[in-house]
Design a protein with these regions (language model features):
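Ubiquitin-like/PB1-type beta-grasp interaction modules and other compact soluble beta-rich domains
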Residues: 2-11, 16-136
Length: 136
């Protein structure tokens, strides 16, 4: 009986350890880690996120998606609402901003310039640097 209980306990311990050892894709609960590489695909770009306190996280996104928005949505890094102008991004890397509530919004940048297109209408350019910055 004691040997059987020891065996069962050992099996449970092994299963718990296997569950804890699962590979991390760099995104946990919609938050990409600084320096992480997330996704899979032939194209890659750098993503910078600057929060309302000035904190900056930079990570690499690999994708086969056609648009930056699709690539980030697929990884769970952004979320928002569809509008007649496209995707209104409210959450980036786990932080939600809503202009109607807090007077702040996520501004989208392409290679350091304020974007003239929305994230869901911006094609993925291999090697580009895209950014979301919290702004008033």
């Amino acid at each position: 009986m004691k040997k059987m209980m020891t065996g069962v306990l050992a099996l449970v311990l092994v299963l718990v350890m296997v569950g804890c050892g699962q590979e991390d894709n760099g995104v946990v609960n919609g938050v990409a880690k600084d320096g992480a590489t997330i996704g899979e695909g032939a194209k890659s770009f750098t993503m910078e996120v600057v929060d309302k306190d000035g904190g900056k996280v930079t990570f690499t996104v690999k994708t086969d998606a056609d648009t930056v928005g699709k690539a980030l949505l697929d990884q769970g890094v952004i979320a928002g609402e569809d509008s007649s102008y496209g995707l209104y991004v409210k959450t980036v890397n786990g932080t939600t901003l809503d202009y109607d509530t807090d007077g702040m919004y996520w501004a989208f940048y392409i290679n350091g310039e304020y974007a003239q297109t929305g994230v869901d209408a911006t094609g993925v350019e291999d090697g580009a640097v895209y950014a979301f910055r919290a702004e008033k």
